[in-house]
Amino acid sequence: MKSRKEMRSWLDDFNLNHPLVIAGPCSAETEDQVLKIAYDLKNTDVSIYRAGLWKPRTRPGMFEGVGAIGLKWLDKVKKEAGLLTATEVANASHVKLALEYDIDVLWIGARSTVSPFIVQEIADALKDTDKIILVKNPVNPDLSLWLGGLERLYSANIKKLGVIHRGFSTYEKSKYRNNPEWQLPIELQNRFPDIPLICDPSHIAGRRDILQDISQTALDLNFDGLMIETHTDPDNAWSDAAQQITPDVLVKMMEGLKIRTLTSDEADYKNQLNTLRTQIDVIDHGILETLGKRMKVAVSIGELKKKKNVAVLQTKRWNEILGNMILEGEKKGLSEEFVLKMFKAIHQESINNQEKVINS
């Protein structure tokens, strides 16, 4: 699969002067709820109305969606509110039903993207379709799986493709529900610059208070659109209540986002420069996050050394680390001088932290 300009044609056809906005409830709950939200979104920047009908939940016993009956409600949304409709599909049966009700946009969820078997089943069921098909990143940070999903769909003669970045699961404590790991969608964008890239800040955040910040970062990284879970009564939503916002809040949030526009070669240069600088900011934050984790491990080592009455400085171990890192640095185009300075500073901070533990 090669990046082609026509991959963006479905997005260009919207002729928008703002990022694409996909919004609607995490789950369709009742017909009244679905239509009420749709009416509230009708005269906003929202182009596509989303609602989950089949909900793949982590554990059984939780609300798993209303199922096929919700397709009738989405049909009413299209006819009465004039919005395009979107829902998640996880197997060939879902695809068949969604196509029967003329759903405009189908997305493959994170739990499905991890399985080539599921993606292939969906691709076979969608073969030759002219519907817009979006692929969410897999649950785990694996770019090959994400690209593999796109390639299977492309091989089934599906040309209207896009990707949704919803973050990645992690065992580590984080302010995010799913860590953004921005470097992965950036890498995908670098390889396939013509595939529309949409951010799902709702699933990255898992809470309302950081939705705008995540959305702004996505736009600064040149994402083409946002998918935001929206509900008229989010606190009482049947699923993912904490991350949903009202249509009014969505409108205010969109008004508060800074959206860059290109009007000249100079603007194009500034846009590209801003995107690259944002990428550096994301990477720098990742470096600090990693260094913080490293220092926590160093403190744990200090506690163990204190318990066993072992000296802080272990010269043999330090020389091994330095030698290995210099070799690794050379492979990545980093000079020996730079690697030495950096790891000496890191090592000194580790020693300082361990000495604090031992002397406490």
Model-derived segments and spans:
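Active-site mouth loops of central-metabolism enzymes
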Residues: 19-36, 60-65, 84-88, 109-110, ...
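N-terminal amphipathic alpha-helix/helix-capping segment at the start of soluble metabolic enzymes
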Residues: 1-22, 76, 255, 265
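N-terminal small/glycine-rich loop or linker at the start of catalytic domains
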Residues: 8-26, 57-60, 189-199
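Catalytic alpha/beta core domains of metabolic enzymes, predominantly
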Residues: 14, 118-249, 256, 262-268
